[in-house]
Amino acid sequence: MGIQSSWFYSSKHQSAKREGMVKEGKGGIVSELIYSNNQYSDNQYSDNQAVINRILLPLLRQSGNEARWLLWVSPHKKLSRQWLINSGLPLDKIIQLNRMSSITTVEAMERALASGNYSVVLGWLPTLSGKDTVRLQAAAQKGNALGFIMRPQDVSKETSRAESRSDLLKIHSIHYH
């Protein structure tokens, strides 16, 4: 089927939620991934992208085995079919929405997370208000989904600030070591 251009999928395909695959309120989280903008190639995601390759791809591969979809909302680049294949991601479970304003993107992410139809929702958003963050978190919990707010960072401009910051990658966990 390939990469879908819309997350409104035909009614002949029942959602995982309606099939009882998702239990509302049992989980779900929204987190933020900041990655180096310098390692982002013009046509596809770079093989040198540590955050993408080491953290996100294994999670996406695992989630691709579920009955639910993987949604990419307003990425800066069109997903490369070849990159998806090389990354081991299921082409028939990837949906991509493009060219949305940040306000519409937040709303689309919220609706997708809450629907229960998506195991993972990735959105490229500017810094969110506290209200938007709470909305996305509640939606993720309702739909038992993982939401990632993707933020590119230009390393050449941020190197001096990055050395003094420890919050470049936010990983939320209930377990502390």
Curated annotation (Swiss-Prot):
Keywords: Cell cycle, Cell division, DNA damage, Septation, SOS response. The keyword Transcription regulation does not apply. Pfam families: SulA (PF03846). InterPro entries: Cell_div_suppressor_SulA (IPR004596), P-loop_NTPase (IPR027417), SulA_CellDiv_inhibitor (IPR050356), SulA_enterobact (IPR047696). Is rapidly cleaved and degraded by the Lon protease once DNA damage is repaired. The record marks 177 as: Essential for degradation by Lon protease. Residues 112-118 are annotated as: FtsZ binding. Residues 170-177 are annotated as: Lon protease binding. The keyword Amino-acid biosynthesis does not apply. Induction: By DNA damage, as part of the SOS response. It comes from the Bacteria. GO terms for biological process: division septum assembly; DNA repair; negative regulation of cell division; SOS response. Disulfide bonds: none annotated. Coiled coil: none annotated. Belongs to the SulA family. Interacts with FtsZ. Component of the SOS system and an inhibitor of cell division. Accumulation of SulA causes rapid cessation of cell division and the appearance of long, non-septate filaments. In the presence of GTP, binds a polymerization-competent form of FtsZ in a 1:1 ratio, thus inhibiting FtsZ polymerization and therefore preventing it from participating in the assembly of the Z ring. This mechanism prevents the premature segregation of damaged DNA to daughter cells during cell division. This is Cell division inhibitor SulA. The lineage of its organism: Bacteria, Pseudomonadati, Pseudomonadota, Gammaproteobacteria, Enterobacterales. The gene is sulA.
